[in-house]
Amino acid sequence: MSGSKYKPAPLATLPSTLDPAEYDVSPETRRAQVERLSIRARLKREYLLQYNDPKRVSHIEDPALIRWTYARSANIYPNFRPTPKNSLLGAVAGFGPLIFWYYVFKTDRDRKERLIQEGKLDRKFNISY
């Protein structure tokens, strides 16, 4: 077993304990990790202070969540790229119902007109016989 090497699964990441870079970290990388952890701890402490405040009267606004919501919903046009698929879907969604209802009404009207001309349709509320 001493010669066997760990082979990661194709869709799973390598565990950090088996990653050789986990223990051979340069001072700059370690400094960046410590800085990120300190920012995260500060933000977490700030959130917990707001969350556990007994005099809180409104909800806590998370700026990252607000930015994400804005980018997801209200700001779609700068991120929109027209493609043939988008164009086809837009045409189907825009003109498809119009064409469908035109076909339904036109065929129904033509069928009734043909039955009237053949005298097979009983027109109950016809005023001008």
UniProtKB/Swiss-Prot annotation:
<comment type="similarity">
    <text>Belongs to the complex I NDUFB4 subunit family.</text>
</comment>
<keyword id="KW-0679">Respiratory chain</keyword>
<feature type="modified residue" description="N-acetylserine">
    <location>
        <position position="2"/>
    </location>
</feature>
<dbReference type="InterPro" id="IPR009866">
    <property type="entry name" value="NADH_UbQ_OxRdtase_NDUFB4_su"/>
</dbReference>
<keyword id="KW-0597">Phosphoprotein</keyword>
<keyword id="KW-0007">Acetylation</keyword>
<keyword id="KW-1133">Transmembrane helix</keyword>
<dbReference type="Pfam" id="PF07225">
    <property type="entry name" value="NDUF_B4"/>
</dbReference>
<comment type="subunit">
    <text>Complex I is composed of 45 different subunits.</text>
</comment>
<dbReference type="GO" id="GO:0045271">
    <property type="term" value="C:respiratory chain complex I"/>
</dbReference>
<protein>
    <recommendedName>
        <fullName>NADH dehydrogenase [ubiquinone] 1 beta subcomplex subunit 4</fullName>
    </recommendedName>
</protein>
<dbReference type="GO" id="GO:0042776">
    <property type="term" value="P:proton motive force-driven mitochondrial ATP synthesis"/>
</dbReference>
<feature type="transmembrane region" description="Helical">
    <location>
        <begin position="88"/>
        <end position="105"/>
    </location>
</feature>
<dbReference type="GO" id="GO:0009060">
    <property type="term" value="P:aerobic respiration"/>
</dbReference>
<feature type="modified residue" description="Phosphoserine">
    <location>
        <position position="26"/>
    </location>
</feature>
<comment type="function">
    <text>Accessory subunit of the mitochondrial membrane respiratory chain NADH dehydrogenase (Complex I), that is believed not to be involved in catalysis. Complex I functions in the transfer of electrons from NADH to the respiratory chain. The immediate electron acceptor for the enzyme is believed to be ubiquinone.</text>
</comment>
<keyword id="KW-0496">Mitochondrion</keyword>
<keyword id="KW-0999">Mitochondrion inner membrane</keyword>
<keyword id="KW-0813">Transport</keyword>
<keyword id="KW-0812">Transmembrane</keyword>
<keyword id="KW-0472">Membrane</keyword>
<dbReference type="GO" id="GO:0005743">
    <property type="term" value="C:mitochondrial inner membrane"/>
</dbReference>
<dbReference type="GO" id="GO:0005654">
    <property type="term" value="C:nucleoplasm"/>
</dbReference>
<dbReference type="GO" id="GO:0005739">
    <property type="term" value="C:mitochondrion"/>
</dbReference>
<keyword id="KW-0249">Electron transport</keyword>
